[in-house]
Amino acid sequence: MKLFFASGSPYARIVRVAVRELALDVEEVEVTLRDPNSSLLPYNPGGKVPTLQLDDGTILNESLLVLAYLDTQHGGRKLLPMDGADGWRTLSELGRAYAFLDAVTVWNRELRFGQSAPGVIALEKQRADRAADALEAAVAGGAYSGPIDAGQIVLGAALENFARRHKVWDWRMGRPHLSRFLDDIAARPSFAATVQPELNL
């Protein structure tokens, strides 16, 4: 298998963390984005990461689809358990973490490229604060705990992405449980090996 990624993408990082947690043999190829000459384009004309090429040439993109495929490639505990209450709990937590990541990634892009008026930016911050407050309460109540799973990986990648690449929003303020969650998960070897470069916004 071959995984195309960009070091600044939190979505690609989610998959790179999963590869390491599952101890899978995957070749990683770093590519450029927003580049008409990117080596990614023959594999994914949309130019998005992560993109996974299977051994038979099949192409998968979107991090959740790639996670689901990787989970079929090992015999251990699943990152996406699909049976019983644990499966639905994991999917619920995963959905909340992805919604959080998506919301702040849009805000981050708007700040970076100056695409929105101040009023829109203010609305994005309010949405991010609401989501972070809900996640703080969820973590305080015992969510995103236990053996590593996809929901924890996505939430950890999201929080560290914001900490390293979105400096205008201090999500840690008043959210000790989220802060502790990130400190703990960031210490895992899979996270330490895939740290994103910093970006000052």
Model-identified regions with their sequence ranges:
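Short, hydrophobic secondary-structure boundary micro-motifs
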Residues: R77-M82, P147, W171, A192-Q196
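GST-like domain detector, emphasizing the conserved glutathione-binding G-site
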Residues: M1-G119
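GST-like fold's C-terminal all-alpha helical module
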Residues: A97-R180
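Non-transmembrane alpha-helical segments in soluble domains
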Residues: L67, D71, L91, A132, ...
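Residue-level signal for nonpolar/aromatic packing positions in well-ordered secondary structure
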Residues: L52, L135, I153, I185-R188
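C-terminal end-helix/capping segment
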Residues: M173-T194
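Carbohydrate-binding/catalytic loop surfaces
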Residues: L199-L201
